[in-house]
Amino acid sequence: MRKYEIMYIIRPDVDEESKKAVVERFNNILTTNGAEITETKDWGKRRLAYEINDFRDGFYQILNVQAGAEAVQEFDRLAKISDDIIRHIVVKEEE
C-alpha cells in the first residue's frame, strides 16, 4: 500500500449536514476498498483562485491515506461523476 494525499472541493451551496454526508460517503468509499485514512483536515470554506462551474468558493477537504491503487481509482471515478465535488486531486507521496 502506498501513501496518498487527496484534496477535494465541495460545492459551496450545500448545507452543513449535506457536507458531512459527502465527506462521510467519500471516506467510506476509501475504507471499504481497503484504504486506511491516517489524517483528515477540513479547511472550511475558501475562495477559489478562479471560477469553477460558476462557483467562486468551495469547502476544502484534505485526506492523507494509505491505500492500494483500486481504492484510489474508485475514489477518483466517483469524484468525477459526483455533482457535490467540483474539483479533486490525488497525489502519490514519495516514500
Swiss-Prot record:
Any GO BP: translation
One Pfam family it belongs to: Ribosomal_S6
Coiled-coil parts of chain: none
Bilayer-crossing regions: none
Keywords: Ribonucleoprotein, Ribosomal protein, RNA-binding, rRNA-binding
SUPFAM superfamilies xref list: Ribosomal protein S6 (SSF54995)
One example GO MF annotation: small ribosomal subunit rRNA binding
GO cellular component: cytoplasm; ribonucleoprotein complex; ribosome
Organism superkingdom: Bacteria
Function recorded in the entry: Binds together with bS18 to 16S ribosomal RNA.
Family membership: Belongs to the bacterial ribosomal protein bS6 family.
Protein name: Small ribosomal subunit protein bS6
Organism name: Bacillus licheniformis (strain ATCC 14580 / DSM 13 / JCM 2505 / CCUG 7422 / NBRC 12200 / NCIMB 9375 / NCTC 10341 / NRRL NRS-1264 / Gibson 46)
